[in-house]
Each structure stands twice: as C-alpha cells, then as structure tokens.
C-alpha cells in the first residue's frame, strides 16, 4: 500500500509538471521536433548532439528549437543564422548559460568565459586585448614557443619506433608553453612524467574530463542547487587544487614585485592591479581552454595528415621552399599559405568546440521572424556550418586547396568558419591559438615521418568523435614516429 501511494504521488507530480511545461511553451518559436513529456527531446541527442542537431537542421531548418528536459533551446545551423546570433543580436543574446557543474561562485564571478558581460568582464577582456594578446606581446614571446617546440622534437626523437599517443605529448608541450608565457617557467617535464608540477597537468586533465560529463541538472535546473550528484563540489575541489599549485608562484612573484620584470603574463596581470581571484580565474581559463582546444586541433590535424600523404608532401615542399634546411620559426608562418589553408580545413571539419559555448537570451527578441524568449539557451552548431553543402563545395572531402583562393578566415567575421566563435564572446586567445597550431604542425611535419602501429592501414584509422566541451578524437591517435634525416 505504501509503495502504491508513493507511485500515485510521483505520477501525479510528473503529470502536473508535464501540463505546466506544456502550457508554458512560448509561442512562435522556431520549428522543431515534438517534445516528449518531462524529458523533452533529450532521448534524441545520443552521444553526439552536434551530429544529431545537424540532422534536425536538415528537417526543420537553419534555426530550430527543441526542449532538453525543462530547458528551451534554439540551435543555429547556417552562416546566416549564426550571423543573426553572433552579430545582429549579439548584445541581447550575449548572456552565458553556465553549466551546473561549473557554477562555482568565486570562479564564475571572475571568469572571462562564464561571467555576464559586466564591468568586471569588460576589464578582463580589455587586459587580454590590450596586454596579453597584442601582436607585440605575441611576437615578443615567439622564442619561448619555438624553444618548447624544439624540446618536443627532442623528446619525440627519443621515442622513435615506439607507439606514441601524440595528443598527450602535444598537451604537455602546450602546458609548458603556457607555463613559460605566464610564469616564465616549465610546469611539466616531458622526459620525466613524475617530475615538475605534474599535478597541475593531471588536475587540468581531470577538470576538462569533468566538463565532458553529463549533469542532469543542466536539463532540469530545479535540481541544480541541490548538487545531487556532487559534480559542482568535485569541480570546486579540483579548481582549488589548481589554484594551490600556482598560488605559491603568485605569492613569490608578489614578494618580488618591483624587481626586474620578466615580461610574462603574471607581470601584466599584477601591474593591472588584478586581485588573486581574478588572476586565478583568468589563468585557469588560459591553461584550460588554451591547451585542450589546441591539443585537440593538432591531434585532428595529424590524423588527417596520416590519411592524406599527398597533403603531407605539399606542406613539406612548401617548408623546403620557404625555410630550406633551417628550423621552422613563427616568422615563417605568414609565408606558408598551404600550411595555413591546411589548418583552416582542419578547423572547418573538426572545430574544437562543436556547439561553441551556449549563450542565453537576456531579453525576448525576434530572430529570423521567430521569437527567442528571455532566458532561452542558444547554441551555434559550428560543426554543422563547417559541413553545410549550401556553403561548401564537396563539404565532407578534406581539401585545403579550397582556402587558397578564398579570403574566408576564422577571426570571427566570416560566419562560414567560426571555430572560435564570434561577436563580443569570441575567444580572446584566438591569435595565440593560431600560432600554436600552425607552428606545432609545421614542426612535426618538418622533423618526422610517421605510420600507424602494428601494420594498421589508414583505411582502418577511426575518425570517430567524442563529444564534450571540446571535440576529441575517439580513440586517441596512436602513431609510430621516424625522425627525418634532413629537413629537406
């Protein structure tokens, strides 16, 4: 009898919730699939929402809506729809939907990624735009990135003939690049995985993995404050562990303030008068977003090259013509148009953040003659846009040549190619990310040949994706490297 009573009460509550949600559905939304009671369209997502959204766009149009649990979501899937979201209505749609696991108050309030576009956010963006990522600052630190690329080559030469998970090596290299840009020191030892600040790398990996896990509260926000699954608490603990690692370095630098400047990011942030909470949040996002997205892009690039030996030959020939037998440097990159076209093509098919980061409508507005209600969540499917046959000729064919005769770029003005977003929320580290990808790909192609392990053919190489905050290759790429006797 008690079980029956509980069942009746539970069913009554769900039925009540269903009618509340049904009656509160906004009018004149973009078209979309009919939602099921309670769960909405959640069961249609699968493990690759970006691909499922692309299929829904083919049926319902470039701007469609759906219900994910109790959340109303609108998805843009064409350059025109993306321009409406990221440019025409950029201001009113600039709110950020913060994933429930990452709603750690001290971090969100000081975050350049998750906070609202308030005065604090504007200050952090200004510091990035006018201090950290200026052409002058980036150029002044090119020798650091080149030195770390050479160290990567030295490490990989020592692994010749062994099976290497290339994304881990690239990730470690990028962590050290950021360590030197920010603190003027390595934080990870490629030669000794147990040495250096290995815990920082491990904490970053752990945090990024948490970002790829599902939290039911994202679909039923009423559960959010309860943190029933402990995911927010776990994120807060890892964030604190990361802050503790570089807290010692920050304290040391504050103690020596006024002595000889190291001209690194910490100097800039301290001179800007930022407190530790702001610095912690900004450094977290530089390390986290800057390393993972670039590492993913480079892994996809090497995967495509593994399947396309002719493309490898073209990049290598261009390197010979421009660089000769010298080591490739960042100053060479503007003179390597085919390499740049190759990286663009990689980003077209494998955008690091396939749905960008979700936005939120600050007020009700009209987009493409449809109503976008206040608090609605908005996603832009950069993955689908990059594969849109109405925009790209033969879109599923990997063809860098398409960019040699095109002015389309990924700097936020061409909505056909938006791997880093656009509008006021565009990734502030875009100029640096571009340097990373081009330099490391060029360095690997110049110094190594590689093959798949155990005689695997390229036709057996999986191109499957693992969806998350970043679009990872699944499984990770394993290769066997062979050092080239000459750069020519």
Swiss-Prot record:
Keyword Transmembrane: yes
Swiss-Prot/TrEMBL cofactor(s): heme
Membrane topology field: Single-pass membrane protein
Primary enzyme class: oxidoreductase
Binding site for heme: 427
Protein location: Endoplasmic reticulum membrane; Microsome membrane
GO cellular-component term (any): endoplasmic reticulum membrane
CDD domains reported for this sequence: CYP76-like
Any Pfam family: p450
Tissue: Expressed at low levels in roots.
Gene Ontology biological-process entries: secondary metabolite biosynthetic process
EC assignment: 1.14.14.102
Primary site of residence: endoplasmic reticulum
Regions that span the bilayer: 2-21
Keywords recorded for this protein, A-Z: Endoplasmic reticulum, Heme, Iron, Membrane, Metal-binding, Microsome, Monooxygenase, Oxidoreductase, Transmembrane, Transmembrane helix
MF terms in GO: heme binding; iron ion binding; N-methylcoclaurine 3'-monooxygenase activity
Record's catalysed reaction(s): (S)-N-methylcoclaurine + reduced [NADPH--hemoprotein reductase] + O2 = (S)-3'-hydroxy-N-methylcoclaurine + oxidized [NADPH--hemoprotein reductase] + H2O + H(+)
Biological pathway: Alkaloid biosynthesis; (S)-reticuline biosynthesis; (S)-reticuline from (S)-norcoclaurine: step 3/4
Similarity annotation: Belongs to the cytochrome P450 family.
Function: 3'-hydroxylation of (S)-N-methylcoclaurine.
Protein name: Probable (S)-N-methylcoclaurine 3'-hydroxylase isozyme 2
Lineage of the organism: Eukaryota, Viridiplantae, Streptophyta, Embryophyta, Tracheophyta
């Amino acid at each position: 009898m008690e079980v029956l009573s509980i069942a009746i009460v539970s069913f009554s509550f769900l039925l009540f919730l269903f009618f509340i949600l049904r009656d509160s559905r906004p009018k004149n939304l973009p078209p979309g699939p009919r939602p099921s009671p309670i769960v909405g369209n959640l069961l249609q997502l699968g493990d690759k929402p970006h691909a499922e959204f692309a299929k829904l766009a083919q049926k319902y149009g470039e701007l469609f809506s759906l219900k994910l649990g109790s959340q109303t979501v609108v998805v843009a899937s064409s350059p025109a729809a993306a321009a409406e979201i990221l440019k025409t209505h950029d201001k009113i749609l600039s709110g950020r939907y913060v994933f429930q696991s990452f709603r750690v108050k001290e971090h969100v309030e000081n975050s350049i990624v998750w906070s609202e576009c308030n005065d604090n956010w504007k200050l952090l963006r200004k510091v990035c735009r006018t201090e950290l990522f200026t052409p002058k600052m980036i150029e002044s630190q090119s020798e650091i990135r080149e030195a770390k690329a050479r160290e990567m080559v030295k490490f990989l030469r020592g692994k010749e003939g062994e099976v290497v998970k290339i994304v881990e090596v690239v990730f470690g290299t990028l962590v050290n690049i950021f360590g030197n840009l920010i603190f003027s020191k390595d934080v990870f030892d490629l030669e000794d995985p147990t040495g250096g600040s290995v815990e920082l790398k491990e904490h970053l990996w752990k945090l990024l993995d948490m970002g790829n896990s599902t939290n039911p509260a994202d679909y039923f926000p009423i559960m959010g404050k309860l943190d029933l699954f402990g995911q927010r608490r776990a994120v807060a603990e890892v964030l604190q562990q990361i802050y503790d690692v570089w807290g010692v370095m920050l304290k040391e630098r504050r103690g020596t303030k006024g002595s000889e400047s190291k001209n690194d990011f910490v100097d800039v942030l301290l001179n800007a008068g930022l407190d530790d909470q702001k610095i912690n949040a900004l450094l977290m996002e530089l390390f986290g977003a800057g390393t993972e997205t670039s590492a993913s892009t480079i892994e996809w690039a090497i995967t495509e090259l593994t399947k396309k030996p002719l493309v490898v030959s073209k990049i290598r020939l261009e390197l010979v013509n421009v660089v000769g037998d010298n080591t490739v440097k960042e100053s060479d990159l503007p003179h390597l148009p085919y390499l740049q076209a190759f990286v663009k093509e990689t980003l077209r098919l494998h955008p690091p953040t396939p749905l960008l980061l979700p936005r939120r409508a600050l007020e009700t507005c009209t987009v493409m003659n449809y109503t976008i209600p206040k608090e609605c969540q908005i996603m832009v499917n950069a993955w689908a846009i990059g594969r849109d046959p109405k925009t790209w000729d033969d879109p599923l064919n990997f063809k860098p040549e398409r960019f040699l005769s095109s002015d389309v770029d990924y700097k936020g003005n061409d909505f056909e190619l938006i791997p880093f977003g656009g509008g006021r929320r565009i990734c502030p580290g875009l100029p640096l990310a571009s340097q990373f990808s081009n330099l490391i790909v060029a360095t690997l192609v110049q110094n190594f040949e590689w093959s798949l392990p155990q005689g695997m053919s390229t036709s057996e190489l999986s191109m499957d994706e693992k969806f998350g905050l970043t679009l990872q290759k699944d499984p990770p790429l394993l290769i066997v490297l062979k050092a080239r006797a000459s750069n020519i």
